[in-house]
A protein has these predicted regions:
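Membrane-proximal alpha-helical anchors
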Residues: 2-68
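An amphipathic alpha-helical interaction surface
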Residues: 71-79, 83-155
Length: 155
């Protein structure tokens, strides 16, 4: 009888441990999603809203003069996007949440800011200007292409 009690207690302990681990990881996933939402809200308020005021033509003009104040301001705003992209690419932030929030927006933003990005890369060929942002956009593009394939195949 004592053997059955010991086995039952051990099984209950194992199940409790497994449940505790599951709860812990579920909490981590939720915290990561919440951190993504919080970081994106800050990014939107401090950066994306300002970048929305520029057009690709305007960015092209600004990119012609790297000494201009607007060039420096745009570079600083893009640096914040780069920092956010690092968080997404290193899985600190949840890429699925980012896709749901702004996948098309980031693709359009990269396209709009490309003249400035290319200018910075021309000036300093050894530096990695906005590589993480570009990696995020490419990842989003691959995901969108897969989604299109799936929907066109009727799956």
């Amino acid at each position: 009888m004592e053997l059955y009690i010991s086995i039952t207690a051990a099984l209950i302990s194992i199940v409790s441990f497994g449940f505790s681990v599951w709860i812990y990881y579920a909490g981590l996933r939720r915290q990561r999603k919440q951190a993504t939402l919080d970081a994106f809200n800050i990014l939107q308020g401090q950066v994306l809203d300002k970048l929305n005021t520029y057009t690709k033509t305007g960015v092209r003009e600004i990119a012609k003069n790297p000494r201009a104040e607007e060039y420096k301001e745009l570079s600083a705003l893009l640096a914040r996007c780069e920092h956010f992209a690092v968080g997404v690419n290193t899985k600190i932030y949840d890429v699925k949440i980012v896709r749901r929030l702004a996948e098309k927006y980031f693709v359009g933003l990269y396209d709009k800011m490309e003249p400035l990005i290319q200018k910075k890369r021309e000036i300093n060929k050894t530096a990695k200007h906005y590589d993480e942002f570009e990696k995020l956009v490419k990842s989003v593009n691959r995901y969108q292409n897969k989604q299109r394939e799936v929907s066109s195949n009727g799956i």
